[in-house]
Curated annotation (Swiss-Prot):
Disulfide bonds join C12-C48, C16-C52, C23-C41, C26-C37. This is Neurotoxin B-II. GO terms for cellular component: extracellular region. It comes from Cerebratulus lacteus (Milky ribbon worm). It is found in: Secreted.
Length: 55
């Protein structure tokens, strides 16, 4: 992923990384509801990848 986002799209990469970090925090906070976090993360990752490709 970093090869796609690296250099050319630093702002996009940083935003995606923050979203991913938030997702990891969610999994830690809601360990018993991991499915909810996984779905949330998948949406963020997909939208982020689309944005990076378009820009």
């Amino acid at each position: 992923a970093s090869s796609t986002w690296g250099g050319s799209y630093p702002a996009c990469e940083n935003n995606c990384r923050k979203q991913y970090d938030d997702c990891i925090k969610c999994q830690g906070k809601w360990a018993g509801k991991r499915g909810k976090c996984a779905a949330h993360c998948a949406v963020q990752t997909t939208s982020c990848n689309d944005k990076c490709k378009k820009h």
